[in-house]
From Swiss-Prot:
Biased composition (Basic residues): 898-908
Record-annotated disulphide pairs: none
Cofactor binding annotation: May bind 1 zinc ion per subunit.
Any one Gene Ontology cellular component term annotated for this protein: plasma membrane
SUPFAM superfamilies per the UniProt record, alphabetical: Helical scaffold and wing domains of SecA (SSF81886), P-loop containing nucleoside triphosphate hydrolases (SSF52540), Pre-protein crosslinking domain of SecA (SSF81767)
UniProt protein name: Protein translocase subunit SecA
Binding residues for ATP: Q87, G105, E106, G107, K108, T109, D512
CDD domains referenced in this protein's UniProt entry, alphabetically: DEXDc_SecA, SF2_C_secA
E.C. code: 7.4.2.8
Complex formation: Monomer and homodimer. Part of the essential Sec protein translocation apparatus which comprises SecA, SecYEG and auxiliary proteins SecDF-YajC and YidC.
Amino acid sequence: MFGKLLTKVFGSRNDRTLKGLQKVVNKINALEADYEKLTDEQLKAKTAEFRERLAAGASLDSIMAEAFATVREASKRVFEMRHFDVQLLGGMVLDSNRIAEMRTGEGKTLTATLPAYLNALTGKGVHVITVNDYLARRDAENNRPLFEFLGLTVGINVAGLSQQAKKDAYNADITYGTNNEFGFDYLRDNMAFSPQERVQRPLHYALIDEVDSILIDEARTPLIISGAAEDSSELYIKINTLIPNLIRQDKEDSEEYVGEGDYSIDEKAKQVHFTERGQEKVENLLIERGMLAEGDSLYSAANISLLHHVNAALRAHTLFERDVDYIVQDGEVIIVDEHTGRTMPGRRWSEGLHQAVEAKEGVRIQNENQTLASITFQNYFRQYEKLAGMTGTADTEAFEFQHIYGLDTVVVPTNRPMVRKDMADLVYLTANEKYQAIIKDIKDCRERGQPVLVGTVSIEQSELLARLMVKEKIPHQVLNAKFHEKEAEIVAQAGRTGAVTIATNMAGRGTDIVLGGNWNMEIEALENPTAEQKAKIKADWQERHDAVVAAGGLHILGTERHESRRIDNQLRGRAGRQGDAGSSRFYLSMEDSLMRIFASDRVSGMMKKLGMEEGEAIEHPWVSRAIENAQRKVEARNFDIRKQLLEFDDVANDQRQVVYAQRNELMDAESIEDTIKNIQDDVISAVIDQYIPPQSVEELWDVPGLEQRLQQEFMLKLPIQEWLDKEDDLHEETLRERIITSWSDAYKAKEEMVGAPVLRQFEKAVMLQTLDGLWKEHLAAMDHLRQGIHLRGYAQKNPKQEYKRESFELFQQLLSTLKHDVISVLSKVQVQAQSDVEEMEARRREEDAKIQRDYQHAAAEALVGGDDGSDEMMAHTPMIRDGDKVGRNDPCPCGSGRKYKQCHGKLS
């Protein structure tokens, strides 16, 4: 109450922010008359003038008003479009590391030109990031004339470009592209073998369109570059035949499980678990098929791989539904994005789930993949010096943007008042009653000439509605993942008189629905249209537009509430753009997923008290509030999952940053001779310590073992026992020095034989290849650790703390093994000439060419520890050498010259 009173008196935080920015808008408006008088050449010269001022020490804020005024004037001349004041406000929000919520149709694409131009003046590059290639190309080509008029270059970064084309795109002042491609390029750059192979510049300013889709919906999806692992397709096929023999355990309204079953499904958590009976049944079936030894347990350490396959098959059959979660097209399983309804060709679920779904559908099973590099969008985008985003729906997720990314959300007012009428939800008892009511509403709208957009949550639902409309002889268009190519055309004409369009989630469609249809697309369809043809098309459109407005504008009809209020708001936001008339309503039933899982008890109780009859709907603010509360619960749960994922990934991210920084230093260095010298002493000393323990008596020394190890691993054939027998004054320290000196002498002899330049190049190649191989193994070990870490909770241990501790131990092993393996390889390999190094490089490039790039969907539970009954024995551990660890005061293995505790040891 008191808070509301304060807001009334002082205004909300959002109002105060906008009030402060309005002063700059007034400055820009004051400059408009002067800028209109400038010639084209004088206006273009402003870019060079701004760059000179920045070079002389001026800040971006000090030139913002003039820069925005320049872009506004250039836009008037190039596009005949003038930025509204609200677009100037949006541009300022985007320049200040914030998120601008701008409603659909308010011109986000034109708004983005303001901060993009301003930040491009620094010469460090601006990345404008969209959700798909079509939008990236469209926005780049649409805005190119404006930026080129002002003397800036524009690049497009999409999949399939050559290395040089990518370099050119990144070297442009402003680069348009998709979030996936920017993330993949970052990973590929950190797998490069020479500075020339890198394409990205340091990450400066990212401006993300549909920011909620990329930073929130995609936050649980890591980008993964992977190579094919061993083929186990036969095992997937065999295990797939087991699952139909299993029975689901029933549950009653009380949520208590009753009856005997083999597995239970937790719909809220999207998890499936074997019951004790199910576990026994699966083990017996496996024994019958000769896949498990008699008396053996599926949960024993030796059968972890088998358990992994069984769990994947069970999840594929019980949690993933055809035409909802995926479609089968041309013999391939293609994922459907639950948030946008789009198909995602090339993406695959990880953890063997995709292969299990392929076995279930009887299509060709592709190999499992081994992770070579990965990063989450959360950690990729947090690396940018400046980050901003825009969307039509951000306010519901404002807390998450602030908490995870440190980005405040500012709601930018619309240019014209919003007059859309949002009606209360109608709730029916059954889905059949709901669909009948929807058909009736559509018929009513068509009678008065009002266009209708029907939003569905799945392809299956859109096809069911389409069949009902065919039966009722209602002409309609279907827009779902299966009809991707026609998308822009269908959306463009969805606002025509009486048009009916069925669409799976409209998020990120990128094309506005114009009342009366899109007349620009009609003109573009003609070859060299005359002025008369253009005028006629415009006049016809105006007539249709007026008729649609008179009929009530676009009517949005939702067939089910989504888990997220934001995606419901995106659907609603398709109507009422730029002050147009419009309306929206959601039709629900007690059989809908959200209602059944989260809101059923309370709403069912209301319906029973009211004595609902068949075909009757309940419409009450209490019901809408109960549904909204259910959505809040789901949103809070999803936020917790994303937050937990980030906490786990932050551990890996610290290590990733260290390894990638190390690689870049290695690549950029002329020579790593000093690094090799620093680590050789550590490695040889560590091996000596294992056979001659420090400060120990001679009786405890294993001299024959040391001689053998030095010869096997470092090609050092030394008569250590002979030295000790002949020289009484030879003690532990002097012996250590002599062995290390012997290695140095042998290495110097190798250098004299092949030449210093060849050996220096070989050292770099060996260090990089060894680091990459160990990093790949380390990622696999981290994956296994993460999958089983949740079980530590049963032992009263904090899984996060355990994960941090064990992952750091794994990282220490990585650094230790890196030192050892590099010195061992350099000792053993005989380099004859430059051609040997070139041959090694050629082999490495051949291997690189075999790597397939996969964008994998890792289910959240796979990332933060699944519930598959696996345990710590699952963790793959690299080769461990006793006593071969890095001491806190030892030189850091990265070769920086600093002590380990002051360098990479800080990770602890």
